[in-house]
Amino acid sequence: MYYIVEITSRGSETFLEGFEDIGEAWDVVSRLRCEARRRRQKVRYEVR
């Protein structure tokens, strides 16, 4: 199982969703990163 983790500028981590397929997880991370850039949020996303 692959999980998306949201990491804030303060270092706090929030586990968002779990995915069976790593490709699907990375697609969601890509969309989240684009949305964060549009909102100018200082957030990082990883798949673990």
Report the location of each language-model feature.
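Short, mixed-charge low-complexity intrinsically disordered segments
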Residues: 13-17, 26, 30-48
